[in-house]
Amino acid sequence: MIKIKHLLNEIIENNSIQSVVDRVYPQIVKDLGGQMKPVEVHENIWKQVDAVGIEDLKREQGNPEARYNPHNGVIYLYSEKTNTEEDIIRSLLHEHTHTLQDQKEFKKLYDQGFNYGNHPFEEEAKRAEENWEKYKIK
């Protein structure tokens, strides 16, 4: 019974997240340029990839809010961390910015020693998040 309740809560939560995505993502694309990408909602990255030892992985490797996969062109939002209107909008702005960036250069800069905290493309994506209030429900 608990498992069913958890699953129902997850479905409701994911539907709420999807409704924010449906409302704001087209405007984000219009404002920033580029093309709309598919957006998928999962509880967390580790469940998405069917990992074993999820709690250990979260502690050791983190638990991101969202990510963009340039190989399949999908933006992933993780409901465990991205579940408020602000979180969703910020994540969409951040990840859509990555869809506009040169992915070979993105990887090259990481290979050269940049990390999440100082990578120029991450800094650009973080700056894009600052405009999140433009998209919130008034």
Where are these regions (language model features)?
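Post-HEXXH active-site segment of zinc metalloproteases
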Residues: 86-90, 102-131
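Short, solvent-exposed loop/turn segments at secondary-structure junctions
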Residues: 46-47, 82-83, 106, 133
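Short alpha-helical catalytic segment bearing the HExxH-like zincin motif
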Residues: 76, 87-96
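A metal-dependent hydrolase signature that marks the N-terminal structural subdomain at the beginning
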Residues: 1-60, 73
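Acidic-residue sensor for enzyme active/binding pockets
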Residues: 10-13, 95, 122-124, 129
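Active-site scaffold of zinc-dependent metalloenzymes
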Residues: 52-86, 103
